[in-house]
Amino acid sequence: MDIGSIRHDFTEHPPLLEQDLAADPIEQFAAWFQYAVDSGISEPNGFVLATVAADGQPSQRSVLLKLFDEEGFVFYTNYSSQKAEEIEKNAQVSMSFPWYALQRQIHVYGRAEKIPREQSLAYFLTRPQGSQIGAWASPQSKIIESRDFLMLKWQNMKAKFHEGKIPLPDFWGGYRVRPHKIEFWQGQPSRLHDRFLYEKTENGWTVSRRAP
């Protein structure tokens, strides 16, 4: 199928200038993230996480951001999943927030590290009960024989934990991505898009405009 005729011009925003940007990329991320939330787009905290296997093969998946601050970006997962196994071998990852409806993207490059278990527990206890049970029931990234197998395991776990709080699995928790580069992209007419790259140095952050 030839889809070369599918195209869309970008006219949503005025040109982005360096003086419009915050000196700190986390502050700039917060401003754009709030704009995304206020715009009403679906799951503005959704991003694409890229990891690399030991053989050099990259893989990607959609993940939900659950916290960000000056220390970085936090997400949660099964520590036996493909993404976690790849992070254990190569902690360098990238995160992309593809806000197509807003004609904006943010790309984060950094190193992933496990967060303290008590922090994972605090978040786990805020999850809906079904999601807590799901964390126990799903052997994430492993081969399973059918959906019925998964649903039966979920029902068994629900019965097991029918009394009291559901404990945090030993194999489940969070990662924090500590960024060393963050790029902000904003669409402009004639494909003359705005791109600014923040890079971390010993003295803080530098920012430079990059050609689209």
From Swiss-Prot:
FMN binds at residues 61-66, 76-77, 83, 105, 140-141, 185, 195. Its EC number is 1.4.3.5. SUPFAM superfamilies: FMN-binding split barrel. It catalyses: pyridoxamine 5'-phosphate + O2 + H2O = pyridoxal 5'-phosphate + H2O2 + NH4(+); pyridoxine 5'-phosphate + O2 = pyridoxal 5'-phosphate + H2O2. Binds 1 FMN per subunit. It is an enzyme of class 1 (oxidoreductase). The keyword Flavoprotein applies. Substrate binds at residues 66, 123, 127, 131, 191-193. One of its GO terms (biological process) is pyridoxine biosynthetic process. Pathway: Cofactor metabolism; pyridoxal 5'-phosphate salvage; pyridoxal 5'-phosphate from pyridoxamine 5'-phosphate: step 1/1; Cofactor metabolism; pyridoxal 5'-phosphate salvage; pyridoxal 5'-phosphate from pyridoxine 5'-phosphate: step 1/1. Its cofactor is FMN. Keywords: Flavoprotein, FMN, Oxidoreductase, Pyridoxine biosynthesis. One of its GO terms (molecular function) is pyridoxamine phosphate oxidase activity. Homodimer. Belongs to the pyridoxamine 5'-phosphate oxidase family. PANTHER family: PYRIDOXINE-5'-PHOSPHATE OXIDASE, PYRIDOXINE-5-PHOSPHATE OXIDASE. Catalyzes the oxidation of either pyridoxine 5'-phosphate (PNP) or pyridoxamine 5'-phosphate (PMP) into pyridoxal 5'-phosphate (PLP). This is Pyridoxine/pyridoxamine 5'-phosphate oxidase.
